[in-house]
């Protein structure tokens, strides 16, 4: 029986394109599975457990994801970080590790998250872009999408932006920032001449909420829905989303902020 005596907060970066999300699942490759397997190699035993601050969907990447390690032995954070990075796959990196006290709760204390959704339109992008962004063949009305993105700011009922919404769930969420701008976060010689990023920041999110918000704005940019449709969708009425679940490979968990 594991008796937790020591607690460590791990800050992670990963390219999610070849993984089935963060959380361990039977017979598929996940980030948590790879981390746990590497911890066994580094520590020489499996007398620990890990818990993520949040889940991520398959193919979603992270610039700043966090998890907590519960251990029954003291571990030097600097040694552990170096050892993990020597043994983890090249698409997973531990950026830092810090010891925390037993009252720290990695899920409850992670109060603010910032997501980025990258997209472009027009001529098909270079295949090397596939892990990083969503491509739309048709022209998008970017100014209209920018206007639509601002509607999400504030407290709203996001029932229509939750995958398989349960009627008993609280769908009220507060979005502190929602905006679309030209992408200057990630660039490369193979990137399109111009690409865009939807930046969404909030205290908590429903399942696939950000991807449904992105899909809704893409439909707005294609002229398939209106600004008024988005406004009405935030009262929680209706049975079906007005948008679609945008491809996961465009989504990045960019920041996780703790109390």
Protein language model features and the residues they cover:
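Structured-RNA-binding interfaces characteristic of tRNA pseudouridine synthases
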Residues: 1-259
């Amino acid at each position: 029986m594991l008796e937790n005596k020591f607690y460590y907060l791990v800050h992670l970066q990963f390219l999610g394109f070849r993984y089935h999300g963060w959380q361990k699942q039977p017979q598929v490759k996940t980030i948590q599975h790879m981390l746990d397997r590497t911890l066994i190699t580094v520590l020489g035993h499996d007398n620990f457990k890990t818990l993520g601050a949040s889940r991520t969907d398959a193919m979603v990447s992270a610039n700043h994801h966090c998890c907590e390690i519960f251990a029954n032995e003291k571990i030097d954070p600097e040694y552990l970080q170096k050892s993990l990075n020597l043994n983890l796959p090249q698409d997973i990196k531990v950026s830092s590790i810090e010891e925390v006290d037993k009252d720290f709760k990695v899920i409850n204390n992670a109060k603010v998250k910032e997501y980025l959704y990258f997209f472009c339109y027009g001529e098909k992008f270079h295949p090397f872009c596939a892990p990083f962004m969503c491509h739309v063949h048709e022209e998008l009305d970017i100014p209209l999408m920018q206007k639509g993105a601002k509607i999400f700011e504030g407290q709203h009922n996001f029932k229509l932006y939750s995958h398989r919404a349960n009627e008993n769930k609280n769908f009220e969420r507060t979005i502190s920032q929602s905006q679309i701008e030209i992408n200057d976060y990630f660039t490369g010689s193979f990137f399109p001449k111009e690409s865009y990023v939807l930046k969404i920041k909030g205290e908590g999110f429903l399942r696939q909420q950000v991807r449904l918000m992105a899909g809704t704005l893409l439909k707005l940019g294609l002229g398939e829905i209106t600004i008024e449709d988005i406004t009405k969708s935030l009262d929680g009425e209706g049975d079906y989303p007005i948008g679609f679940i945008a491809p996961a490979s465009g989504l990045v968990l960019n920041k996780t902020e703790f109390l």
